[in-house]
């Protein structure tokens, strides 16, 4: 059993937390942020997640009390090898409106592949320079990052492990993230990923905004992802005087710098700009108890809003186990043409509308206004099913990244692992129309 299996967490979404490593319980200053001399010879450093003048209800920042300030490092140099399958530049990619489905992305075939070594971009839209957009990536690895940390200057990472637990060390402390859990690492926070074996998963990256809980409207004060179930790390530090590599994703490109100490030297911190995790199995599902199929927005876990009210740069939506009991209703998802782009992934089990070709570790993209919906077998079965109450999606967990932006498929993903027969899922659908007599 690893130390990570025994971790304790701070609870609550967006809370104003305060924590010190138990080895130095008085690390935080009392009544101020930046004393003339911090206790134990620590340095005070603020990490800003929003503009200073953002409304107080939206303002995000944390104060870190660390052994050395982050500014102690040698100059950054470009890392060309990391740009091979990664991009945040979608403007030059040819458009492609077809339905796409990818088979499970392969695990590494050679040893020593870390999280940061094997990140590859599937699709995305927007722009990191103007800081409005998103990108969807996959990762696969089989080795831990040793004396290496990374951070994203462009935006937030929402990490969805599909196979293998991730032991994530951050400046704020440590997180154990298992499949069917997610982690969010906000912009600028340094972190390192250790694994226990072959691991893979998905990443939703957003720039120019942060994830927040969706409004509940008429649902009321409770439901969906409850704030109390989000977990942030307690302070933990290491005082290591060894060479570390700091990897920085900046304007969609990769850079690295060397420094002579661990970046995970924060002895205490307070604030509301933090990394966090969430167990998807704790999601409280809302569904119809009368008739018709509810829109998938009722399954939203987190949203990254755009400047247009009610419209997201990205929503993170899940389809967890639940009861289906709608009367006189076609219960699977309906046929749809959407003004949003929909990327789907599968963590475990099978997806209710496509039980055959959609496998854990794979994905699908239905671009803006591209038709999609249940395959032939699903339609035939659901149209003739006995409409008794039954469990839906039992033993499965699928998810969707939905965006108001057009998404371009990268040149790499157009050809890699593609299910070229995906369109055939709908070809057997029959004409059932009969004219009235």
UniProtKB/Swiss-Prot annotation:
Residues 15-34 are annotated as: Disordered. Plays a role in the tyrosine degradation pathway. It is an enzyme of class 1 (oxidoreductase). Expressed in the hypodermis and intestine. Fe cation binds at residues 336, 342, 372. Keywords: Dioxygenase, Iron, Metal-binding, Oxidoreductase, Phenylalanine catabolism, Tyrosine catabolism. Its EC number is 1.13.11.5. Changing residue 173 to R: Suppresses fah-1 RNAi-mediated toxicity. One of its GO terms (molecular function) is metal ion binding. One of its GO terms (cellular component) is cytoplasm. It comes from the Eukaryota. This is Homogentisate 1,2-dioxygenase.
